[in-house]
Each structure stands twice: as C-alpha cells, then as structure tokens.
Swiss-Prot record:
Name the record gives this protein: Large ribosomal subunit protein bL21
Keyword Transcription regulation appears in the UniProt entry: no
Organism domain of life: Bacteria
Gene: rplU
NCBIfam families membership: L21 (TIGR00061)
Protein's organism: Dehalococcoides mccartyi (strain ATCC BAA-2266 / KCTC 15142 / 195) (Dehalococcoides ethenogenes (strain 195))
Record-linked InterPro entries: bL21-like, bL21-like_sf, Ribosomal_bL21
UniProt record similarity statement: Belongs to the bacterial ribosomal protein bL21 family.
GO cellular component, as recorded: cytoplasm; ribonucleoprotein complex; ribosome
Role according to the record: This protein binds to 23S rRNA in the presence of protein L20.
Amino acid sequence: MGGVNIYAIIESGGKQYKVTPGQLVEVDLFDLAEGDSIELDKVLMLNDGETVTIGSPTVPGAKVTATVAGHIKGDKVFAYRFKAKSRNHKKTGHRQLYTVLTIGEILTGGAAEKPARKPRAKKTNEVTTDGA
C-alpha cells in the first residue's frame, strides 16, 4: 500500500494498545488537564517500518508521546444481584472514566534489533575404516 507502517504496542493501566501517530486512544483515567502532554515509556513492541523490535518486557529507550484530548465516561455497566425465593434483588450501575489521548510521536530511542544468532555447525558422523 504506499505508506510506511509505523506502530507501537504500549501498556497503560494493565491493558495493551496498538498505537500509530495521530491516532486517538481511550485509556484509563490520567490525572492530567486537557492539552497536557505525557510520555508513555512502557513500549512492549516497536515497528519502525523496517525492523520489528520486541521488548523483554519493554523496549529500552523507546517512548510514545501523547497529548490529552479530553476526558470521557464510558458506557454504563449494570450489575444485578438476585437471591431466589426471598424477594431480594439489587441493580447497580457504573460508568468508567477514560482519558482520550492523541498519539504524537513514536520515539525509538536507538532501539536496535538484537543480532541474529550464528547457525550451529552441522555435526558429521565420520565412519572409520579401521574398525575402531
């Protein structure tokens, strides 16, 4: 397709997100004002268009910069408790708060791919003719 496919997989709030520059992402609430910038340094995987770097557990030196676009509430989640034969039930609801981030730049920080291992030497079974 014509463009360079740069993306990173980051971790925020115990969840993983695949992000690209310019993308809007809803993550768990950050205590930041709208317009503030944040650096997300838990980069689990990085694809810069040429090489793919997988961290163990994170890619050293890699960062993703983002700005806070706003705060929103998620859909309402209902919890219903019910006990049979006792007319006992209770319905409660909850709306999770999210922060909307605009992904700015994916910085590799000089993250380089590990050098490939050398192939093992092939074992050869030598047959001796003297019977030993």
